[in-house]
Amino acid sequence: MNDERRIAVLVAFAKIYTQNAQDDVIDILDRYLTDLFAKTYRKEQKERLRTIKDLDKAARQLREACITLLEHTDPSIHPKVAVFKKVPEKDLIQAVQIVDSLTCPPDQTLAYSELLQYYGTIRKFLPLLMEEIELQATPAGLPILQAWNFVKEHGDSSKKRWRNAPLVGLNTNWSKIVVDKKTRTVNHRAYTFWMLEQVVDALRRHDLYIVGSVKYGDLRAQLLQGEEWKAIRPNVLRSLDWSLDSYESLAPLKEELDLAYHQTVENWDNNPAVQIETFAGKQRITLTPLQKLQESETLEILKKRIQDMLPNIDIPQLLLEVNRWTGFMNDFRHISEAKSRINELPISICALLISQACNIGLRPLVQDGVPALARDRLTWIEQNYFRAETLTEANTRLVDFHSQLDLANMWGGGEIASADGLRFFTPVKSVHSGPNPKYFGTGRGVTFYNFTSDQFTGLHGLVIPGTIHDSLYLLQCVLEQDTSLQPKEIMTDTAGYSDIIFGLFGLLGYQFSPRLADVGKSRLWRFDATSDYGILNPLSKGRIREDLIHRHWEDMLRVAGSLSLNKVNATHLIQALQQNGKPTMLGRAIGEFGRIFKTRYLLLYLNDENYRRKILTQLNRGEARHSLARAVFYGKRGELHQAYRAGQEDQLGALGLVVNAIVVWNTRYMESALQVLRNRGHTLDDNNIARLSPLGHEHINIVGRYSFILPEEIKDGQLRNLTYKEDRLME
């Protein structure tokens, strides 16, 4: 590497890692404050339990006083005298003080008194943080930026100067702690904690942003705008099939929604699965769950025959054989982009894939006397060949190869995909993991949020700390995948979804199809208040705000264009638009647009049992794929021991790649087995073939010692001999 290239690499390294470090610092601050707030709240709750007897006594005294007051009817005796006769004034005052000190408002989730004890810890790092992090604000974030700058300038000032602290945005609960009612002085410790809570929240919404940051940067600057938007606008409109005229764009959507209503109403009497019932005086739709689709005897026989015919194989041989067909290991290139290839590189790549995907490390794979499996060589190749870029390219090659197999196309055409999360406990300390008692107990973990195509292949995945708002990452996952399969309908399991997500999917030409656990909680929306939708009239009173859509239409198109061209991160944009349940005006407009697609989807979901079955079938494919991934990722009790995001992404990317290799190998050998059965005179039902799955692994040796030597007869691409029994084939 010459001097100019070396300097360029160093400058690029410094810039990128400065950006990453800034993002990590904010992530750590967010995690620290979240943990601190939770810890102090739990501590206060324990303290309240310890004093429950005092609280009970005080509450009983107040009860006696209230009963006396309510039952008092003697006009000759003052009510206060009657109360004090029952409960002495001194005891009553003490009871009020106890209740005041031991209780808190129902909407208070912070233990303020406990929290302020950690002010000294905060001040140890806060001045340096404020010096290194350069915050800027959108108009909505200016009050919070003023509070940040005030603490930055006056953190160690006298109490007098704190009287001038900006208090815009201070809510009722914080106000009681921050500002003394009598003296109007500001508690600098409470103010600092309030400011930090607001800053972190504003950074999530992008009301505040960090100059030069990737995750917390200024989203407005990333969107297409000005002359750049005008120049590219015709291409965006053409590719997304929208008109710049909002009225022209909405006209066909109105017709489609009206037609969906009428079709649902007309078919209502022939749809026994859907009913309207009354709960607590309100009408709600109820939907009978789908019954399990039974397997026919011929399907069970076919599955058994195919499984018996598949050859037994070690996982390394499977990977090497798939490489013979596809050449996917050629996508693992040296980081320097050098074109020279070292001897027996596929064997080394294969060993590294197994070490990562099976979560067993290098030790079980190192073999003395085999240069390709020497520890030093494996470590060197891991450092220079294994990275997100090469894993993605190798995975793309597998997906593309699999999509050309006839059997894969009998399962689906690639137009549909499902998204779901695979949870991993992370016993190591990591800022890139998060809590969730349901999945991780008292520890932390990550979610590998990934896509499964209708051909059973995995398309793309993202690592999410903990399990936070999986649906936020859905659109990002869709837009980042670049295989030959381009699904247009994305199905997800029951999870939180919003009108904004429906709207963004609709703008970009995708159908968002979540499985609904409680369809009765969903609302139906309409354009025309006078339209007669029969039995659905009481349930479709909400009107779509066309005026908002018309007013913000070009900005909505600009957002869609920016997303489609990867100018802006979809997850960050959705967070900014939603603003913790208080969407921006543009977010509201996109949400109104999303109500069109959501209502149309809900009506189809209610009206068509086959559509509901299709969603369930695809989601089951994703769950079955996750079961295979669990079987492969067997080492270290299935726990992920990667502390850094890059390591987590690389290891789980390797897992997805190995699972795809298993799918490719199984599909090709299943094709061969089906052809043998046809050649022997068996009549095969296409409906049964469509219900086969390439996710079986009983014939694959995943656990144990491995062989990296391919039999001579298959080195040139031939298939292994099938292991079938004559009597079973002749049935």
Regions found by a protein language model. Give the residues of each.
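Structured, charged N-terminal subsegments at the starts of enzyme catalytic cores
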Residues: D258-D368
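Structured nucleic-acid-interacting core domains from mobile-element enzymes and related host factors
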Residues: L398-G434
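Long, compositionally biased intrinsically disordered regions
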Residues: S531, P538-E731
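Long amphipathic alpha-helical coiled-coil/heptad-repeat bundle
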Residues: M1-E255
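A glycine-rich phosphate-binding loop feature that marks nucleotide/adenosyl-phosphate handling sites
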Residues: D420-L422, T494-Y497, G520-S522, L573-G581
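Histidine-/acidic-rich catalytic cores in large beta-rich domains
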Residues: C350, G414, G443-G445
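Short coil/turn segments at secondary-structure boundaries
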Residues: R333-E337, V366-Q367, A394-R397, G412-I416
